[in-house]
């Protein structure tokens, strides 16, 4: 998802993973894919079905093809019905499959627009997904109830649209009478996804903060580079959210730091200047991460955490006031 690329990039960095390929299961209608932006940030390739109608991909996939990574691969299964270009991806040992919007958990993708066809959908699920081993885990593109995985055995038995003894005519009758409203982002998402998520003019609209060299972690917190902070302390407000005895204790504190314990911060944010950046610090970086959430809720647009806190700051031999010598 385009808006989640920063989060996804953070996870890749934290786990020291290299993104080789971004697989789009189809041209989505309810959100814009992050494939293009991920390619801009990581150099990954974009892969999508050759029947999708999308432009700008690096790999166009066909039924029976493979997407290789390391010593493993995903096999490509064409599963149209939601759209013409829907594809599902099955791990080489058939232990798991990624079904896009073809088969959802106790449901399936809609078939009433974007080349949708309930007859085709029924056959795709029955022939390409329900034919997998019972214990094959199924991961759909999304789920509106917060679920993440099911299995072939479960869906074959309990899917209220496609499971059990339901026939093709049963399924077609069900799908033709859903009477769903069109997705809210339809007019934005489909044109963008037909370009693999590339924005107009190929300009990146999600610029990172530029007031300091920051890193966005998977927990959703901006973190500041300690070297930059030491050199530019006068340009920011250093907020120490420890308790008073810690502030004057063995670790000392960063020169010029403002002491506001985390428990009091929500009611004392007016002691800080919203126009100037704030860097939060604590003993090890945990409380100060929560301080960033408090500051953002109070309207501070420029706020970052000092990872590792005073423990790391002291261990690197950086300047402090007070503390043990």
Residue ranges and their predicted role:
Residues 2-47:
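Active-site metal-binding motif and surrounding structural segment of the metallo-beta-lactamase
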Residues 262-315:
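Catalytic cysteine-centered active loop of the rhodanese-like fold, especially the PTP/DSP P-loop
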Residues 47-50, 100, 141, 306:
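Generic beta-sheet signal
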Residues 1-19, 55-146, 151:
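Catalytic core of the metallo-beta-lactamase
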Residues 317-325:
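Active-site neighborhoods of enzymes that stabilize oxyanions during catalysis
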Residues 123-137, 141-227:
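Accessory terminal helices/loops
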Residues 47-54, 242-246:
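Short, polar loop motifs at secondary-structure junctions
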Residues 202-280, 323:
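Positively charged, proline/Ser/Thr-rich regional signature most characteristic
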């Amino acid at each position: 998802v385009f808006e989640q690329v920063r989060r996804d990039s953070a996870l890749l960095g934290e786990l020291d993973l290299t993104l080789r390929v971004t697989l789009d299961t189809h041209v989505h209608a309810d959100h814009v894919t992050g494939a293009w932006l991920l390619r801009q940030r990581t150099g990954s390739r974009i892969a999508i079905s050759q029947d999708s109608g999308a432009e700008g991909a690096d790999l166009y996939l066909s039924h029976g093809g493979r997407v290789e990574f390391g010593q493993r691969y995903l096999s490509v299964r064409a599963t149209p019905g939601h759209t013409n270009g829907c594809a599902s991806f099955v791990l080489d040992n058939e232990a798991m499959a990624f079904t896009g919007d073809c088969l959802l958990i106790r449901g399936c993708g809609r078939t009433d627009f974007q080349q949708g066809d309930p007859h085709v959908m029924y056959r795709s699920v029955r022939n390409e997904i329900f034919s997998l081993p019972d214990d094959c885990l199924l991961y759909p593109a999304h789920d509106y109830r917060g679920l993440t995985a099911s299995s072939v055995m479960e869906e074959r038995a309990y899917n209220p649209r496609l499971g059990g003894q339901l026939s093709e005519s049963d399924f077609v009758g069900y799908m033709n009478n859903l009477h769903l409203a069109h997705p809210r982002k339809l007019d934005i998402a489909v044109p963008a996804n037909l370009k693999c998520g590339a924005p107009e003019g190929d300009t990146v609209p999600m610029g990172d903060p530029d007031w300091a060299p920051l890193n966005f972690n998977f927990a959703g917190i901006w973190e500041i580079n300690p070297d930059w902070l030491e050199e530019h302390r006068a340009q920011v407000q250093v907020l120490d959210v420890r308790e008073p005895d810690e502030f004057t204790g063995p670790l000392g504190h960063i020169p010029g730091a403002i002491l506001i314990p985390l428990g009091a911060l929500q009611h004392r944010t007016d002691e800080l200047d919203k126009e100037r950046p704030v860097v939060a610090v604590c003993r090890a970086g945990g409380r100060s991460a929560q301080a960033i959430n408090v500051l953002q809720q109070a309207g501070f647009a420029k706020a970052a955490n000092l990872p590792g806190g005073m423990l790391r700051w002291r261990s690197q031999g950086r300047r402090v006031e007070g503390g043990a010598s």
